[in-house]
Amino acid sequence: MISRRSVLALAACTVLGAVGCSKTEEYTGPELILRYAENQPEDYPTTQAALAFADLVAERTEGRVKVVVYSGGELGAEQSVIEQMQYGGIDFARVSLSQLAEYQPALSVLQLPFLYTDAPQMWRVLDGEIGDEFLSGLGAMDLVGLSWFDAGVRSFYTREKVETLADLAGLTLRVQESDMMSEMILDLGAKPAQVVYSRVYAALHNAEIDGAENNWPSYEAMGHYEVAPYFLKDEHARVPELQLASEAAMEKLAELDERFPDIIRTCGKESALAERRLWAEREASAEKHMREWGVEVTTLSAVEKARFRAAVEPMYAAFEEQSRLIQRIREA
């Protein structure tokens, strides 16, 4: 039987035959090649962080491990990626919290609106004991949580100007496919509409919906500002994303070198810091561009924001069993 090393050596000789590689020469490339799934395009902050992760792994393992990043959803949609990771079909991935919460309901609490007062509080929570507890819980899914990525803060944008909670009454607003998001819209006095993301522009243009919600980069990239030029900076949701490894991949790494799993965890944390920096730059750039284009931005006063928070408070009743956790988050 031909060994995997022999097959790789033969492949290397085929490619490098022109420079005199002979069949007796030993293959000197990586000993382990792992796959990383990312559904965003290559210039997106999360994909750039995945590429940084791959570079760090190659450097820290002295070339013994190679991580190949497949961007643009090449390895499938996030739900499929999560399932493939559970049996080791994919080794690493960046996935959204909302998708992972479908398999690990305990994570849903992190999607509650107005859970954090600002970004620094969120990172104190996720980079601290609470975040580590959530990452450890992924072991039940045969996954290893490496780090938390930034996915920005979501706000509303509309066809007509909205300044207060009362102005939202009766409006039809597009939200993600999520029971929690739909409930939030209802509690705010509006009507939720689940429109396919690629159709949101047309739905706004044709007045099928009155508004939608998302972060600054997405608002800019999809051109929604052209048909919904009023941005209500309410910052109702800060929902992070996760960088994961499959347990199967970590076992392979440990077999190769007992130091490698810890190296992977370190690379995961370092690449997450890079992603957050890249995201902050992109978010600031998008907001600046939108303001310059002429988008009218309304920032909620402290009093008005308190009204928004109070309106969605009933949603927290469904998380009574995690009330102590919510208190810990709010006190962080």
Protein language model annotation of sequence segments:
Residues 2, 8-120, 130, 138-332:
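N-terminal secretory/targeting leader peptides
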